[in-house]
Amino acid sequence: MKENLFLFFDDKNKLSRNGFERKLGKPKVVEIYKDPNAYTAIGFPAIWYDEDKGKYHMFYNGYVDGKCAPLAAISDDGIHFTPRNTASESGLKNPFAPNQIMEGCGELANVYVDLKAPKSERLKALVTYGDSKTTRIINDPLYTSADGIRWLRQPVQWHNHAAEPGAMAFYNPVLDKHTIIARPDAGVRRIGLIETSDFKTFSDIRLVMTPDSLDEPLAEHYGMPTFPYENYFIGFLWIFHVPNVRERKYYKGTVDAQLVYSYNGTNFNRTLREPFFTNYDAPETKGMVYPSSMYVNREGRLLVAASASENEHGYFKDKGVIAIYELRKDGFISLHTEDSGDVITIPMLYRGGDIKVNLKAEHCSCALYTDDSDKKPLNLLTHELIPLEDFTHENCEEFSGDTLCWSLRWKKGDLESLNGKIIYIELKVKKGEVYSIKGNLTPMMICDLARYHLHGIVPDITGIG
């Protein structure tokens, strides 16, 4: 049975919590990559790990002598990159830089790794091409490649209007479709969504995110790279903080990123209206930071590649680096307590295996409860929590320290004896933070219990099925 991960973006799966506050994780810059020939303030890097050769490849835009070109770099560990000599390998005639991958294609919006495609077309380059005379984007071609060196233009347009660099794609297993996140049209700073099953036909773009009344005054949404993460989809919403002047919103103003998330890859929710990737992580990021690729390297490190610049918006061609951030596994948002806190989940259908907690705490214990819903499935409003005698806080093998995976254990109780039962999980934490709970668990809302006990129906946590 597939395990489910429970992050703390919201309280949907909690019955009660006391003494906790939500706290954003802290991605840390672990490396700064500077292209020797290009400025990459709006490089929007994409990372591909070539399992056959054991190498990480980074594709990005760079300005070389004021001209934009799609470029590539290579790495052994996904952190330390060097330019890849792609221009000579692919036989480019007049490259701007030795690590250029294509000529005359326009700007690189994103390179997507399509694991469902034949190997010859596994890399999909979403490109935007503009008319230099009118400065208007006139088409959005698609290129494919097997190796990231030789690219073939396909006879399709991936956007039915006009996108811009900063678009990206991900696979949605809930719908079994590829999803492209892009602007609804050129210059329209809102977030749209396109779906395709085969990269031959594409849906019309539909709006999924736009500034609201809780955003700071005048803020605009610049892009929203999104990534499947266990049973979630996690996005980095680029926020353009524009100056309060009566002029066109282009020159000056900083860019940072806030967290968004989805259970189904279609409907997205905001989290804390605070920067997750801030402008003060490194001197090179004080003007703009655009996280555009999230990946786990072979060592299990959760990494994010981002374009960054000390310049503010509109000044793209004379500065820019690519920052590599590291983030704690599941370390997006925690439940944090400076003193003591307790949290108990809603009822969960437990189907065997370990229950694991990612946390850092001076002290933590766990107790399990059940209820009488199996005996009174239609008595929806008065289910009583019943302590499980061998799974109390007193019997828990308590934890102190910092771990990505604390497997719950009790001195007497055998967790497997509860397989198939409804349980509630209660954590008591002293001075610490909890990042996630993971296990063969399905959350059961009030009517789900009746449907399960009467008809054996297990709810679909995505909200689509």
Predicted regions, residues:
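Carbohydrate-active catalytic/glycan-binding domains of CAZyme proteins
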Residues: M1-G465
